[in-house]
C-alpha cells in the first residue's frame, strides 16, 4: 500500500469520512556537497520518489488532531488557541507541533485540521524523513487553508521547527529540496542566498541509494563537533563562513590553525568547488567528470572530515568497481553510516545490486538495502 493509499484508508476508518485533500513531500538524496550547507556553501540534492503523505480534513474549531498511521495510529491533539509545547513522550509529534507553532508565529491565520500522516522514506538512513514530514505538514496547512506562503518559506519554517523545537541542528538543504524539487532535475542550492538552479538529470542516468544499515550512533555529537571545528576555522581566517575561502586562501593562511580544523576546512572548501563543477558536469551529461568529483568528495570525507566508517568505504569500493568510469559513488548524508549514492547507467544497476548483495555481507556481516530512485517533484497537492 502506498503512503497516499494508506492515509486515505486510515482517515476514512478513524474519522468516518473521506479526507478533503491529500498532500505529499519527498525525501531527498544529496548527490554532492556534504557538510557544506551550514558553512553557507553549495549542495546538489535531488528529491526522491519516497515521500510523506498527509490526508487532511477541515475542522470548524482550533484543534489539530493528528494520527500517525506508521506508529500504530498513535494520536496527538493540540489547540491552536493555547501555547504549543512539547509532547510528553511522542517524538514524532514534536516535528508537527514545531511546524505549526512557527507558522503561527509567522502570522499565518490557522484553524483546526484533522491529519493522518504516513511515509515510506527510510528512517535513520540520511534520506531526510524528518524534513519530508516537516514540509508535508507545512504544505498541508498551505493547501487546506489557502495560506499565501512560498515553498522557500515552508522550507525555512520546517528548518526552524527542527532546529529550535525538536532540537536538532540542520542546514536548509533538506527542507528546501523537499519543498522545491522538480522531476528529473537536481537542485543546485546556494545555502547563503537560498538561490537555486535546476540542473537537468540525463535521461540515461539511474540514481541508486544503498543503505549500509550501519547504526549511526555517533552522528549527533560528531555533527556538532564538526560544526564547531568549521566555525573555529572561519574565525581563524576572519571570514563569515568557510564559503568565503578558496583553496589558495586556505593554504596561505593556515599558520597557527589547529591541524584538525584545517583538514575539516579543506574538505568543506574543496566540496564547495566540487559541487559547482559537478552541477556543470551533470548538466552536460559528463559522467566521467562527475565520477571523478564524487570520488574526490568521498576521499575528503574519509580522510579530511573523517565521517565515513569502514563498511561505508567498502560499499563505495564494491560499487565503484562495477560502475567503472561512467558514473560515480560516494557516501551521502551526515556520516558514520547511513547511505551511499551512486549515479550510473541503468543497465548496470542489476549488476551493482548483485555485487553488493554478495560481497557486502561477506566483508562486513551486514545486509544492505538498495533503492533505485528517480529525481522527483517537490511538495504539492495530490
UniProtKB/Swiss-Prot annotation:
Cited SUPFAM superfamilies: GHMP Kinase, C-terminal domain, Ribosomal protein S5 domain 2-like
The reaction(s) catalysed by this protein are:
alpha-D-galactose + ATP = alpha-D-galactose 1-phosphate + ADP + H(+)
Which residues does the UniProt site feature Transition state stabilizer point to? 28
A GO cellular component annotation here is: cytosol
Gene Ontology biological process terms from the UniProt entry = galactose metabolic process
The answer to whether UniProt assigns keyword Transmembrane helix to this entry is: no
Swiss-Prot/TrEMBL keywords? ATP-binding, Carbohydrate metabolism, Cytoplasm, Galactose metabolism, Kinase, Magnesium, Metal-binding, Nucleotide-binding, Transferase
Pathway this chain belongs to: Carbohydrate metabolism; galactose metabolism
Detail which positions bind Mg(2+).
Answer: 130, 162
Q: Which residues form the active site?
A: 174 (proton acceptor)
Entry EC number(s): 2.7.1.6
Q: Where in the cell is it found?
A: Cytoplasm
Q: Which residues form a coiled coil?
A: none
Query: Where does this protein hold substrate?
Result: 34-37, 223
Extract the Pfam families matched here: GalKase_gal_bdg, GHMP_kinases_C, GHMP_kinases_N
Quick one: which residues bind ATP? 124-130
Q: Which GO terms describe its molecular function?
A: ATP binding; galactokinase activity; magnesium ion binding
Mind telling me which HAMAP family this protein's record contains?
Galactokinase
| Its job | Catalyzes the transfer of the gamma-phosphate of ATP to D-galactose to form alpha-D-galactose-1-phosphate (Gal-1-P).
Sequence similarity: Belongs to the GHMP kinase family. GalK subfamily.
Recorded protein name is Galactokinase
Amino acid at each position: 500500500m502506498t503512503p497516499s493509499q494508506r492515509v486515505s484508508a486510515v482517515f476514512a476508518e478513524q474519522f468516518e469520512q473521506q479526507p478533503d485533500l491529500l498532500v505529499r513531500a519527498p525525501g531527498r538524496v544529496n548527490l554532492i556537497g556534504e557538510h557544506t550547507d551550514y558553512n553557507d556553501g553549495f549542495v546538489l540534492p535531488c528529491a526522491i520518489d519516497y515521500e510523506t503523505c498527509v490526508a487532511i480534513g477541515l475542522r470548524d474549531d482550533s484543534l489539530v488532531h493528528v494520527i500517525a498511521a506508521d506508529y500504530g495510529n498513535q494520536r496527538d491533539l493540540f489547540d491552536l488557541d493555547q501555547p504549543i509545547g512539547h509532547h510528553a513522550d511522542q517524538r514524532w509529534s514534536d516535528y508537527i507541533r514545531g511546524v505549526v507553532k512557527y507558522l503561527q508565529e509567522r502570522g499565518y491565520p490557522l484553524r483546526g485540521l484533522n491529519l493522518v500522516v504516513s511515509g515510506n522514506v527510510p528512517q535513520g538512513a540520511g534520506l531526510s524523513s524528518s524534513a519530508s514530514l516537516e514540509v508535508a505538514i507545512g504544505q498541508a496547512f498551505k493547501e487546506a487553508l489557502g495560506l499565501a506562503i512560498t515553498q522557500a518559506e515552508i522550507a525555512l519554517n520546517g528548518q526552524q521547527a527542527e532546529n529550535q523545537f525538536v532540537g536538532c541542528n540542520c542546514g536548509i538543504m533538506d527542507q528546501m529540496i523537499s519543498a522545491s524539487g522538480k522531476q528529473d532535475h537536481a537542485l543546485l542550492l546556494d545555502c547563503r542566498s537560498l538561490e537555486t538552479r535546476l540542473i537537468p538529470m540525463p535521461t540515461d542516468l539511474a540514481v541508486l541509494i544503498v543503505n549500509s544499515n550501519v547504526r549511526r550512533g555517533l552522528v549527533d555529537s560528531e555533527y556538532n563537533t564538526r560544526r564547531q571545528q568549521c566555525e573555529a576555522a572561519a574565525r581563524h581566517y576572519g571570514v563569515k563562513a568557510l564559503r568565503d575561502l578558496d583553496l589558495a586562501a586556505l593554504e596561505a593562511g593556515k599558520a597557527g590553525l589547529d591541524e584538525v580544523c584545517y583538514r575539516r576546512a579543506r574538505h568543506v572548501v574543496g566540496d564547495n568547488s566540487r559541487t559547482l563543477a559537478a552541477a556543470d558536469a551533470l548538466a552536460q551529461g559528463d559522467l566521467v567528470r562527475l565520477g571523478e568529483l564524487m570520488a574526490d568528495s568521498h576521499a575528503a570525507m574519509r580522510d579530511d572530515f573523517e565521517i565515513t566508517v569502514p563498511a561505508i568505504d567498502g560499499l563505495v569500493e564494491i560499487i565503484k568497481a562495477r560502475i567503472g568510469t561512467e558514473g560515480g559513488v560516494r557516501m551521502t548524508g551526515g556520516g558514520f553510516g547511513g547511505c551511499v549514492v551512486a549515479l550510473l547507467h541503468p543497465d548496470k544497476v542489476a549488476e551493482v545490486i548483485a555485487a553488493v548483495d554478495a560481497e557486502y555481507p561477506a566483508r562486513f556481516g551486514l545486509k544492505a538495502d538498495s533503492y533505485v530512485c528517480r529525481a522527483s517533484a517537490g511538495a504539492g497537492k495530490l
